[in-house]
Amino acid sequence: MATRTATAAVYGLVLLGVILFGRTLGLAALVAALGVMAGIEFFAITRRESRTPNEFFGLMAIAGMPFATAVWGRLGLLGALTALILAALVWHVLFRQVRSADTATTVFGVTYIGFALSHLVLLRDLDWGAELVLAAVVSVWANDVFAYLVGSTVGRHKMAPGISPNKSWEGFVAGTLGTVAVWIVVWATAGAGLTLGWALGIGVAVAFASVAGDLFESRLKREGGVKDSGTLLPGHGGFLDRIDSLILVGVVAYYLLLMGGAR
C-alpha cells in the first residue's frame, strides 16, 4: 500500500507540475513520454494475439504527434495523422509478409494513444489552457474516486462483468456526478466562456469517455491474457493502466469546449 501511494504521489506531482508550469512544449514532452511508454505496453499486448505491429514506426509516430501539435496546432496533428496513414500504406505495400492486421494494429495503436493524447496539448493552447488540462485530469481522478467509494460500498448492479467485474452502475453514476462537479467548478471559476448547461454536458460526456477508456483497456488486457499492461509503476501496473481513462477525455473535452465557445 505504501509503495502504491508513493508511486501515485510522484506521478500526480509530476503531472500537476508540468500542467501548471511546463507550458505547451513541456506538456508535449510529458505526453510524448507517457505515450511512448503506453505504446510499448500496447504493442506488447497485441503481439500476444499473434499480431506483428511495426513498433519502431509506431512509437516514433506516438512521440512525434504531441510535438507537431505543440508547434503547428491542429494542422500539425492532422498532418501527422495523414503522414502516419500514408507511411503505413507504403509499409504494407513494400513488405509482402506484412498482414493487414499488422498494419491496422500499428495505425490503431498510434491513433488510440498518440493522436488522442495529443489533444491535451491542444487543450493547453486554449485560453485558460492550464486550468482546462488540469480539469480534464482532475475529472478523471474524481470519476475514479467517487466510483470506487460508492461502488465498493453499495454497488450491486454489475456494469460489465465480463470485462471489469468490479465496476457497477451505482459507481458509474457516482463517478459521473464527481466529474460533473469538476466541470461546474470550471464554469464558475475559469474564463472559458461556458454556460452552466454546457459545462454539465461536458462533465457527463467526459465521464462516459473516462469509463469507455478504462473498459477498452480492460478488454484489451483480457484478450491478451495479462492482468496489468506492464510492471514499471510499482503498485499500479503499467503506464497504460494509469492513463487509460485519460486517453479519450482530452479528445472529448477539447471539441466540446470549442463547440461551447472556448478559444
Please identify what each model-predicted range represents.
Residues 222-246:
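Interfacial loop-to-transmembrane junctions
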Residues 1-208:
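Membrane-embedded alpha-helical bundles of polytopic integral membrane proteins
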Residues 147-148, 152, 218-226:
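Juxtamembrane interface at the ends
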Residues 12, 179-180, 242-245, 249, ...:
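Hydrophobic transmembrane alpha-helices of multi-pass small-molecule transporters
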Residues 255-263:
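Juxtamembrane boundary at the C-terminal end of a transmembrane helix
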Residues 143-146, 173, 240-250:
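Membrane-embedded alpha-helical segments of transport systems
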